[in-house]
Amino acid sequence: MLMKNHFKTLVTLVACMSVVPAFAQMMGGPRGGMGMGGPPALDFGGSMGKLFGNNPDFTADIEMQMPGRSGGETMTVPGKIAVADGKSRFEMDMANMKGGNMPAEAASQMKAMGMDQMVTISLPKEKTTYMVYPGLQAYAPVTMRNPEAAKPESDFKIETTELGKETVDGHPCVKNKAVVTDDQGNKHESTIWNATDLHNFPVKIETQEQGRTMTMLFKDVKLTKPDASLFEPPSGYKKYDSQMALMQDTMMKQMGRGGMMMHPPQQ
């Protein structure tokens, strides 16, 4: 029974850790550029950054929606986002996720491991993402694999075509088709709803990924520059060499609580 519980914990951990990369594919430059080999972070550099026009710095509540495969239940992931100078910070709580194929006990098990809350800090110029876990007071760096990450804004051009006018979350919007082209001729197409009362901020973005429409909704948008400290890992947290090392140490602690030998973390 003990080993069965540990196996369920491991399965839950892997399932939860794979959630954000699925959404990151819609935001990380070339489609699939982030994939499973990239960090589970939201990248607002590259082609994605062009969609925000003259609004490079902001904070907002964000909700990401992704339909399940073969007509499965839509997964919804809410969180908070802060963006400045191409850097981004995304905060999420596993307890607030809905739908998808997440195990029913996922939230409680992640909370027991101290991994229910997760913060990703994406630094495109450094090609690094920090995975931060407040419940563990720990973090780990991950190398960004998005080839667009460090490209200057001048390498991208955007063309928009008006599709109509709609209201989104109380904001009057112009619905546009947006096509971003990089210096290699690669094109990324999205549908965006630019709020005319928010300096044309895109309060809704839709893009296609593997035949599915992925959606981002932004609420409580503030067009002010976030504090620079938000884009740095907490100084008092333990730093691991890799996310794998962090996960392994967390699993060993969990197994130790169940009566198995617990290995102390490497300093």
Range-by-range predicted roles:
Residues 2-11:
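Bacterial N-terminal signal peptides that target proteins for export
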Residues 26-267:
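Extended soluble regions of mature proteins
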